[in-house]
From Swiss-Prot:
It catalyses: (2R)-3-phosphoglycerate + ATP = (2R)-3-phospho-glyceroyl phosphate + ADP. Pfam families: PGK (PF00162). The keyword Nucleotide-binding applies. The keyword Repressor does not apply. This is Phosphoglycerate kinase. GO terms for cellular component: cytosol. Substrate binds at residues 19-21, 34, 57-60, 115, 148. HAMAP family: Phosphoglyc_kinase (MF_00145). It comes from Thermus thermophilus (strain ATCC 27634 / DSM 579 / HB8). The gene is pgk. The lineage of its organism: Bacteria, Thermotogati, Deinococcota, Deinococci, Thermales. Pathway: Carbohydrate degradation; glycolysis; pyruvate from D-glyceraldehyde 3-phosphate: step 2/5. Signal peptide: none annotated. One of its GO terms (molecular function) is ATP binding. It is found in: Cytoplasm.
Length: 390
């Protein structure tokens, strides 16, 4: 993989694909983590004498939509990098090209949301060529988007000398440790809504791990597959056989699987709703399990004791609606308390929990990519990485 150390930026206009897909509310950025993570790469290039053109997406707009403008991101970036300014032009436009060509060394230009361009997600060759006119070299530092074969990730990388930024390098180094000779015992904690989102990563990691802890709504598909009564909890009915098969494979490989023993349940998902605790395999209708229960929190903390490598992706409950955030926070605390272990967390809600607890420094690596980290652990590479190796 070509890295920033292979690039002499002096006097060059460098096109950088960053991941500024951050939460924005009332025109203000709510969490600047991804902006801060991009700064080492940007400052390195500026110190080397480059001018920079930045590309990013925000949300999933269906074409130009002021709600998804990168203007608030430009404002937040400026607070950390005064050289930066936002230009409200789609990156494939003539205006964007003129703005880019007028840059002087030391200047930074953030262009409008790449997803305002109709060809972005189709990896349109013509759009990729228009992006390529914006710079003389390309740096991919958007790990959170590196699993998407889009024009601003893969298309343009084939048309310019392409390099991995520092964040990309850091992510690949940390996640590779989870695949190559991880220190044992190795525990994986998976949560979130769907088994189908995690099948690939479970299949890839099963031969490498010792313990698998499953929480979140995806646990109910496993519990029902084992004959449990799960009330109105979310279940992927078409994945029951697969869930059973995965449990059988885990047993054959000597992997200990931990499923919830009890759950916090309610009749509907809303803050302050009346909750009950039930055994995880005996949830009566009309209740649905919305978080792991107190016994499970203790059992999961015990299951993590002594682990030397831990990967965590996905919440243990409906994290965004208190009190169903408590299980996720408890798991975050249990992992952070491990001494001498290499711990990695990825995925929006899991990372949000770690940040809310103020425990980021206690983790070996906090990944900026949820889907990207899962795909990397499943396949050992990503579309965005493959073009940097070409």
């Amino acid at each position: 993989m070509r890295t920033l150390l292979d690039l002499d930026p002096k006097g060059k206009r460098v096109l950088v694909r960053v991941d500024y897909n951050v939460p924005v509310q009332d025109g203000k950025v709510q969490d600047e983590t991804r902006i801060l993570e991009s700064l080492p790469t940007l400052r390195h290039l500026l110190a080397g004498g480059a001018s920079l053109v930045l590309l990013s997406h925000l949300g999933r707009p269906k074409g130009p939509d002021p709600k998804y403008s990168l203007a608030p991101v430009g404002e937040a970036l400026r607070a950390h990098l005064p050289e930066a300014r936002f230009a409200p032009f789609p990156p494939g436009s003539e205006e964007a090209r003129r703005e880019a060509e007028a840059l002087r060394p030391g200047e930074v230009l953030l262009l409008e949301n790449v997803r305002f361009e109709p060809g972005e997600e189709k990896n349109d060759p013509e759009l990729s060529a228009r992006y390529a006119r914006l710079g003389e070299a390309f740096v991919l530092d958007a790990f959170g988007s590196a699993h998407r074969a889009h024009a601003s990730v893969v298309g343009v990388a084939r048309l310019l000398p392409a390099y991995a930024g520092f964040l990309m390098e850091k992510e690949v180094r940390a996640l590779s440790r989870l695949l190559k000779d991880p220190e044992r015992p190795y525990a994986v904690v998976l949560g979130g809504a769907k088994v189908s989102d995690k099948i690939g990563v479970i299949e890839s990691l099963l031969p490498r791990i010792d313990r698998l802890l499953i929480g979140g709504a995806m646990a109910f598909t496993f519990l029902k597959a084992l004959g449990g009564e799960v009330g109105r909890s979310l279940v992927e009915e078409d994945r029951l056989d697969l869930a059973k098969d995965l449990l059988g494979r885990a047993e054959a490989l000597g992997v200990r699987v931990y499923l919830p023993e009890d759950v916090v349940a309610a009749e509907r998902i809303e803050a302050g709703v009346e909750t009950r605790v039930f055994p995880a395999r005996a949830i009566p209708v009309p209740y649905m399990g919305l978080d792991i229960g107190p016994k499970t929190r203790e059992a999961f903390a015990r299951a993590l004791e002594g682990a030397r490598t831990v990967f965590w992706n996905g919440p243990m409950g409906v994290f965004e609606v208190p009190p169903f955030d408590e299980g996720t926070l408890a798991v975050g605390q249990a992992i952070a308390a491990l001494e001498g272990a290499f711990t990695v967390v990825g995925g929006g809600d899991s990372v949000a929990a770690v940040n809310r607890l103020g425990l980021k420094e206690r983790f070996g690596h906090v990944s900026t990519g949820g889907g990207a980290s899962l795909e990397f652990l499943e396949k050992g590479t990503l579309p965005g990485l493959e073009v940097l190796e070409g």
